A protein has these predicted regions:
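ALDH superfamily catalytic-core signature
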Residues: 6-152
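Short, surface-exposed loop/turn microsegments at beta-strand edges and helix-strand junctions
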Residues: 161-162
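Short, solvent-exposed loop/beta-turn-alpha elements that line the ligand-binding surface or hinge
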Residues: 158
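Periplasmic-binding protein-like
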Residues: 1-4
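Active-site donor-binding acidic/aromatic loop of nucleotide-activated sugar
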Residues: 168-170
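Glycine-rich nucleotide-phosphate-binding loops and adjacent flexible coil segments
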Residues: 165
Length: 170
């Protein structure tokens, strides 16, 4: 049995599997990183970083919601991210041209908003996005695609899975 998800659910699976000595692999409570090495072509990497972080509006366990970059490249990466994020097509997730759709429901929208507020309150640098609905999408649960620059790995937004379109750059 393989499971990726919350620690609470993983404990239940572990308890049930241990009763019958089943083999299992559990990845619990992690937050998937994308690592951008300094010998990479940054401009070519940016679309893949966005695809990893914002695919399914970030509502996936495998979303690459942490971007680890060499410290001396942060400013260059910031600019490339800003240039690219403004090209994202937000809209109907059934459309082939849409790159970012809404959250699944109001509860998830509110959860993502609370994480964004936490990032702001804890001092992460808000590069773009932030609280509220994406411009032009007052109906539905469209979160602004958000990027934080984080100089502290202990922030809640760095440590916990958000399941929304929020990218943390470290």
């Amino acid at each position: 049995i393989s499971f990726i998800g919350s620690t609470r659910t993983g404990k239940k699976i572990f308890e049930n599997c241990s009763k019958t000595i089943k083999r299992m692999t559990l990845e619990l409570g992690g937050k998937s990183p994308t690592i951008l090495l300094e010998d990479a072509n940054f401009k070519d990497a940016i679309p893949h970083i966005f695809s990893s972080a914002y695919s399914n509006s970030g509502q996936a366990c495998h979303a690459g919601s942490r971007l680890l970059v060499p410290k001396h490249t942060v400013e260059e990466v910031e600019q490339l991210l800003l240039d690219y994020i403004h090209t994202l097509n937000i809209g109907d997730p059934k459309s082939e041209t849409t790159q970012l759709g809404p959250m699944i429901n109001q509860k998830q929208f509110d959860t993502v908003q609370s994480y964004i507020k936490s990032g702001i309150d804890e001092g992460a640098k808000l590069l773009c996005g932030g609280l509220g609905k994406a411009e032009g999408f007052e109906k539905g649960y469209f979160v602004k695609p958000t990027i934080f620059i984080c100089h502290n790995q202990n922030l809640k937004i760095v440590q916990e899975e958000i399941f929304g379109p929020v990218l943390c750059v470290l």
